[in-house]
UniProtKB/Swiss-Prot annotation:
Record keyword Disulfide bond present: no
Keyword Transcription listed: yes
Functional summary from the UniProt entry: May have transcription regulation and metal-detoxifying functions through which it may enhance intracellular survival of mycobacteria. Binds to its own promoter region and to the Rv1999c promoter region. It displays strong affinity for cadmium ions, but can also bind zinc, manganese and nickel. Expression increases the intracellular survival of recombinant M.smegmatis in murine macrophage cell line and increases its tolerance to cadmium ions.
GO MF, any single term: metal ion binding
Taxonomic placement: Bacteria, Bacillati, Actinomycetota, Actinomycetes, Mycobacteriales
Name of this protein: Transcriptional regulator Rv3488
Intrachain S-S bonds: none
Length: 107
Protein backbone atom coordinates (compact mmCIF):
# COMPACT_ATOMS: atom_id res chain seq x y z
CA UNK A 1 0.00 0.00 0.00
CA UNK A 2 1.35 3.42 -0.86
CA UNK A 3 2.21 5.95 1.85
CA UNK A 4 -0.66 8.35 1.06
CA UNK A 5 -3.14 5.47 1.16
CA UNK A 6 -1.69 4.30 4.49
CA UNK A 7 -2.19 7.76 5.90
CA UNK A 8 -5.75 7.86 4.55
CA UNK A 9 -6.53 4.48 6.11
CA UNK A 10 -5.10 5.70 9.43
CA UNK A 11 -7.28 8.82 9.19
CA UNK A 12 -10.39 6.73 8.46
CA UNK A 13 -9.66 4.43 11.40
CA UNK A 14 -9.15 7.30 13.84
CA UNK A 15 -12.21 9.12 12.48
CA UNK A 16 -14.53 6.17 13.05
CA UNK A 17 -12.91 5.06 16.32
CA UNK A 18 -13.32 8.58 17.72
CA UNK A 19 -17.11 8.31 17.34
CA UNK A 20 -17.81 4.62 17.94
CA UNK A 21 -16.22 1.34 18.87
CA UNK A 22 -15.07 -0.39 15.70
CA UNK A 23 -13.81 -3.86 14.83
CA UNK A 24 -11.66 -5.17 12.01
CA UNK A 25 -14.38 -6.77 9.88
CA UNK A 26 -16.48 -3.60 9.96
CA UNK A 27 -13.45 -1.44 9.16
CA UNK A 28 -12.59 -3.66 6.20
CA UNK A 29 -16.11 -3.17 4.80
CA UNK A 30 -16.10 0.57 5.51
CA UNK A 31 -12.71 1.09 3.89
CA UNK A 32 -13.85 -0.96 0.89
CA UNK A 33 -16.83 1.39 0.48
CA UNK A 34 -14.28 4.18 0.04
CA UNK A 35 -12.27 2.27 -2.55
CA UNK A 36 -9.50 0.91 -0.32
CA UNK A 37 -8.57 -2.74 -0.63
CA UNK A 38 -7.12 -3.47 2.76
CA UNK A 39 -6.28 -7.05 3.61
CA UNK A 40 -6.35 -8.34 7.18
CA UNK A 41 -2.57 -8.62 6.88
CA UNK A 42 -2.44 -4.84 6.48
CA UNK A 43 -5.37 -3.75 8.65
CA UNK A 44 -4.55 -5.61 11.86
CA UNK A 45 -0.89 -4.54 12.02
CA UNK A 46 -2.13 -0.96 11.49
CA UNK A 47 -4.62 -1.32 14.35
CA UNK A 48 -1.92 -2.85 16.57
CA UNK A 49 0.51 -0.04 15.72
CA UNK A 50 -2.11 2.62 16.52
CA UNK A 51 -2.76 0.86 19.81
CA UNK A 52 0.96 0.58 20.60
CA UNK A 53 1.30 4.30 19.86
CA UNK A 54 -1.45 5.04 22.39
CA UNK A 55 -3.94 6.28 19.79
CA UNK A 56 -6.38 3.38 20.19
CA UNK A 57 -7.39 1.07 23.02
CA UNK A 58 -9.01 -2.29 22.50
CA UNK A 59 -10.90 -4.93 24.38
CA UNK A 60 -12.50 -8.25 23.62
CA UNK A 61 -16.30 -8.04 23.21
CA UNK A 62 -19.14 -10.13 21.84
CA UNK A 63 -20.39 -8.44 18.65
CA UNK A 64 -23.20 -10.05 16.64
CA UNK A 65 -22.80 -13.19 18.72
CA UNK A 66 -19.07 -13.46 18.03
CA UNK A 67 -16.06 -12.61 20.13
CA UNK A 68 -14.31 -9.65 18.54
CA UNK A 69 -11.67 -7.16 19.50
CA UNK A 70 -13.18 -3.68 19.43
CA UNK A 71 -11.16 -0.49 19.20
CA UNK A 72 -11.85 3.09 20.22
CA UNK A 73 -9.76 6.24 20.06
CA UNK A 74 -7.97 7.49 23.14
CA UNK A 75 -7.70 11.20 23.97
CA UNK A 76 -4.30 11.10 22.22
CA UNK A 77 -5.98 9.45 19.21
CA UNK A 78 -8.58 12.22 19.08
CA UNK A 79 -5.82 14.83 19.27
CA UNK A 80 -3.93 13.08 16.45
CA UNK A 81 -7.14 13.04 14.40
CA UNK A 82 -7.54 16.79 14.92
CA UNK A 83 -3.94 17.36 13.78
CA UNK A 84 -4.41 15.06 10.77
CA UNK A 85 -7.58 16.91 9.77
CA UNK A 86 -5.76 20.26 9.93
CA UNK A 87 -2.91 18.91 7.81
CA UNK A 88 -5.38 17.46 5.30
CA UNK A 89 -7.27 20.76 5.08
CA UNK A 90 -4.01 22.62 4.42
CA UNK A 91 -2.95 20.09 1.80
CA UNK A 92 -6.35 20.29 0.07
CA UNK A 93 -6.21 24.10 0.02
CA UNK A 94 -2.75 24.05 -1.48
CA UNK A 95 -3.22 21.24 -3.97
CA UNK A 96 -6.87 21.69 -4.93
CA UNK A 97 -7.37 25.37 -4.21
CA UNK A 98 -6.43 26.48 -7.71
CA UNK A 99 -3.60 28.70 -6.49
CA UNK A 100 -0.62 29.10 -8.76
CA UNK A 101 2.73 28.52 -7.09
CA UNK A 102 6.02 29.39 -8.74
CA UNK A 103 9.06 27.41 -7.67
CA UNK A 104 11.48 29.45 -5.63
CA UNK A 105 9.16 32.32 -4.71
CA UNK A 106 8.67 31.10 -1.14
CA UNK A 107 4.94 30.48 -1.43
Amino acid sequence: MREFQRAAVRLHILHHAADNEVHGAWLTQELSRHGYRVSPGTLYPTLHRLEADGLLVSEQRVVDGRARRVYRATPAGRAALTEDRRALEELAREVLGGQSHTAGNGT
